[in-house]
Design a protein with these regions (language model features):
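N-terminal accessory targeting/assembly segments
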Residues: 1-113
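Switch II of P-loop NTPase G domains
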Residues: 2-6, 30-34, 57-74, 237-238, ...
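C-terminal-of-GTPase-core extension/linker across diverse P-loop GTPases
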Residues: 1-16, 37, 136, 140-212, ...
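Conserved catalytic network of the ASCE P-loop NTPase/AAA+ motor domain
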Residues: 8-9, 76-78, 242-246, 251, ...
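Conserved Switch II/interswitch segment of TRAFAC-class P-loop GTPases
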Residues: 21-23, 59, 89, 278-299, ...
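Switch I (effector-binding) loop of TRAFAC-class P-loop GTPase G-domains
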Residues: 196-199, 220-250, 259, 264-269, ...
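Switch/connector loops and helix/strand junctions flanking conserved nucleotide-binding motifs
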Residues: 24-27, 59-62, 92-97, 114-117, ...
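Short alpha-helix plus adjacent loop in nuclease-associated cores
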Residues: 111-130
């Protein structure tokens, strides 16, 4: 995989840049930059300053206006900042012009996410997927790269007659992309065989926004340790475990979390992870109820799921982290409209129970609150699916050791 863009030796300091547009109001942009700061922290970067600008659309040359770019430059120079991160994907022209003006390292949201994925990838499969995504991202941006890729390959004897350095680099990357795609086809074939060999057990997939507690819930349900951390994208590789509830076995998979503005390169590269979602019989959508914008996160996940798989699948909504939920009651004489922070947990429960009927539950995976109720719900849903598929199968009546 490509070397990390962000140094691991010491914590880098960075400034964040976001645009307020007709599509993104000021409140939304602040939320997006909160998430960008969390992404930066996950990558080992401390976000020390944020810059906002109100524009109808991004400047095609420098993303922000010339005056704002000058303001950023003055801050960067005065405070010896070495990194500026933009919340949206930058074009080749924008990257080149911003780097030329600021004379520091520039990342956009996509590049930052790719860097985190490169750090998180553990298996050969995940590493191959990330490397493919990196090269796809790099290809249209070759003109502004500071170093040439042919150094990684020796260079001598590799250039065709009359080729420029840029053409050589493009060919090297295209060759790498082709090889990585071939590698992934072979890996995906193996994964597909593994999935087919799982037998008649019902498949349940945990899905949700990143950092909502899917891995913690996986640990609680499967009684085996899956890596869980308060960082974005703690899980990259799909983990599959056999879970037994009241003598009923099923397969439970923990998948990579979704996020706003997820790069197309990553969505396409992580095909095998998405296959777990496509081939699942039941989806368990885990939500962080304590997050101030959890409803928008639900929309992001549902939108991504509809892009992955057009078929309707049964789903259970699991509202996690009720132990961390807080709200601010309104004073009686406060006539301003209520916001999300003024709504208590009981009201949210009533709203979502009414919307989802019996397919909704509120838990704390960390504190094990309401886990027995979730297991009972899973038991009923998995049993329904199994009986529908195998009405005369004695599979449900075999004896299993829950330990």
């Amino acid at each position: 995989m490509k070397e990390f863009i962000i140094s691991e030796a010491q914590t880098e300091k960075a400034v964040l840049v976001g645009l307020i547009t007709p599509e993104q109001n000021e409140q939304k942009v602040k939320e997006y930059l909160d998430e960008l700061a969390f992404l930066a922290d996950t990558a080992g970067v401390e976000a020390v300053k944020r810059f906002y600008q109100r524009l109808d659309y991004p400047n095609s040359v420098t993303f922000v206006g010339s005056g704002k770019l000058q303001e950023i430059k003055e801050y960067v120079v005065e405070n010896e900042i070495g990194l500026v991160i933009f919340d949206d994907e930058l074009s080749t022209k924008q990257l080149r012009n911003i780097e030329k003006e600021l004379q520091v390292k520039i990342l956009d949201r996509t590049n930052l996410i790719l860097d985190i994925f490169a750090r998180r990838a553990q298996t050969a499969h995940a590493k191959t997927q990330v490397e493919l995504a990196q090269y796809k991202y790099m290809l249209p941006r070759l003109q502004r790269l500071w170093t040439h890729l042919e150094r990684q390959r020796g260079g001598v004897g590799m250039r065709g007659p009359g080729e420029t350095q840029l053409e050589t680099d493009k060919r090297i990357i295209l060759d790498k992309i082709s090889k990585l795609k071939r590698d992934l086809v072979e890996i995906d074939k193996q994964k597909s065989v593994q999935r087919k060999n799982r037998g008649k057990m019902v498949r349940v997939a945990l899905v949700g926004y990143t950092n909502v507690g899917k891995s913690t819930l996986m640990n609680q349900l499967s009684k085996s340790e899956v890596f869980a951390e308060n960082k974005l994208f703690a899980t990259l590789d799909t983990t599959v475990r056999k879970v037994i509830v009241d003598n009923l076995p099923f397969l439970l998979s923990d998948t990579v979390g979704f996020i706003r503005k997820l790069p197309t390169e990553l969505v396409e590269s992580f095909k095998s992870t998405l296959d777990e979602v496509r081939e699942a019989d039941l989806l368990v959508h885990v939500v962080d109820i304590s997050h101030p914008t959890f409803e928008e996160q639900i929309e992001v996940v549902n939108r991504t799921l509809s892009e992955i798989d057009k078929t309707e699948k049964p789903m259970i909504m699991v509202f996690n982290k009720i132990d961390a939920f807080t709200f601010v009651p309104k004073d009686e004489d406060d006539l301003t409209p209520r916001t999300r922070e003024n709504i208590d947990l009981d009201e949210l429960k009533r709203t979502w129970m009414n919307k989802m009927q019996d397919n909704c539950i509120f838990i704390s995976a960390k504190e094990r609150t309401n886990l027995d109720a979730l297991k009972a719900l899973l038991y009923e849903r998995v049993k329904q699916i199994h009986i529908t598929r195998f009405p005369y199968n004695d599979f449900l009546f075999q004896q299993y050791d829950e330990e």
